[in-house]
Regions:
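Non-catalytic C-terminal accessory region of glycerolipid acyltransferases
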Residues: 21-127
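Catalytic core of membrane glycerolipid acyltransferases/transacylases, capturing the structured
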Residues: 1-18
Length: 127
C-alpha cells in the first residue's frame, strides 16, 4: 500500500501544532483547485489489521467545512488466490470503492462533521 500512497501524492497529517497551519493551507489550496485528497480517518494505516478502528475528526472536518464529499474505500485482506498463490505469502489487499458521502448542509458545522463521520464509519464496516 505504501507504493500506492506515494503514487497518489499522499502526505501524512502532522502531529506537531506548528506544522498544522501550513498543512491546512495546503489542503484548502488543493480543494480550491478541485484536487482529490486521500486521508485515513483512523489517523494511520495499519497493514493487515482487519478491523475498523475509531475515526478521528480531521478528515471529516475538512470535508464538512469545504462542503465536499468523501469517497470511502474499504480495504480488506484475503488469502492469495489465482496466480498469486504461487508466490505470495501474505494476504492480498482488496480495495472496494463505496458510494460517495456528501455533507448534510442542513446541519450546523459541528453536527455535520459528526454526521459525516458516523455515515462513513457505517459504510466501511464489514457486515
Amino acid at each position: 500500500i505504501r507504493h500506492l500512497i506515494r503514487l497518489l501524492h499522499a502526505f501524512p497529517i502532522p502531529k506537531e501544532k506548528e506544522k498544522k497551519k501550513d498543512f491546512y493551507e495546503q489542503i484548502d489550496s488543493a480543494l480550491k483547485h478541485k484536487k482529490i485528497l486521500q486521508m485515513y480517518p483512523e489517523g494511520s494505516l495499519w497493514p493487515y489489521y482487519d478491523k475498523v478502528r475509531n475515526f478521528k475528526y480531521g478528515a471529516f472536518k475538512i470535508a464538512a467545512s469545504a462542503n465536499v464529499p468523501i469517497q470511502p474505500i474499504r480495504f480488506t485482506f484475503v488469502k492469495p488466490y489465482g496466480i498469486y498463490r504461487l508466490y505470495k505469502k501474505k494476504d492480498c489487499i482488496e480495495a472496494t470503492i463505496l458510494d460517495p458521502i456528501y455533507p448534510n448542509l442542513d446541519l450546523d458545522l459541528t453536527r455535520r462533521i459528526e454526521d459525516l463521520r458516523e455515515r462513513a464509519y457505517i459504510s466501511i464496516k464489514v457486515e
